[in-house]
């Protein structure tokens, strides 16, 4: 044994998890919502994420920020969850180019939703339709991470992330306002 006190280690692990859960819990819920449309499956995914984050703090060595660590763990769990779901229920995911060329995938009911809810539903649908690597980049960007931090989480270069973000933002902007700024 390496001489570490397991009780002390568990206490540190619990404290780190409690802090991360308080700091990033809402972001983890948004991430689960982006990866899973089914409410029951989304709850399962969120539980899997929280368990994985808690377990991961036993290995956390501080080489990156806790924020980056939590997002990396959460996105890895979400991607694994999506892969398992696709094996059991195949679903057509879109590349960035296919998304740009396709029509609006949402069927909003304008009488039942406000404009903000409609926009959020459209954005969520567009994000869910993306292939997992693009979805991961968008979600991290929406959580306020910079390209360098996103690159750390995704295992890409900051330049590749910046390029992807530029393309993703352009596609999403076009999908929200296809005729330009004068057409709504």
Summary of predicted features, one role per range:
Residues 2-11, 15-17, 97, 153, ...:
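C-terminal edge and immediately downstream basic/flexible tail or linker adjoining helix-turn-helix-like DNA-binding
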Residues 25, 29, 50, 131, ...:
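C-terminal flanking helix
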Residues 4-30, 40-43, 54:
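A short, charge-rich alpha-helical start-of-domain segment used by transcription regulators
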């Amino acid at each position: 044994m390496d001489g570490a006190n397991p009780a002390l280690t568990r206490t540190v692990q619990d404290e780190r998890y409690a802090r991360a859960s308080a700091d990033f819990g809402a972001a983890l819920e948004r991430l689960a919502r982006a990866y899973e449309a089914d409410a029951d499956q989304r709850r399962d995914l969120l539980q899997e994420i929280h368990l994985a984050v808690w377990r991961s703090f036993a290995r956390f060595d501080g080489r990156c920020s806790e924020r980056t660590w939590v997002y990396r763990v959460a996105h890895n769990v979400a991607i694994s969850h999506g892969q398992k779901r696709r094996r059991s229920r195949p679903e057509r995911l879109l590349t960035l180019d296919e998304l740009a060329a396709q029509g609006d995938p949402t069927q909003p009911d304008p009488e039942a939703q406000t404009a903000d809810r409609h926009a959020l539903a459209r954005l969520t649908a567009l994000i869910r339709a993306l292939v997992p690597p693009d979805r991961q980049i968008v979600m991290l960007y929406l959580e306020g991470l910079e390209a360098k931090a996103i690159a750390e989480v995704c295992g890409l270069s900051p330049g590749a992330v910046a390029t992807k973000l530029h393309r993703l933002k352009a596609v999403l902007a076009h999908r929200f306002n296809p005729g330009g700024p004068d057409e709504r």
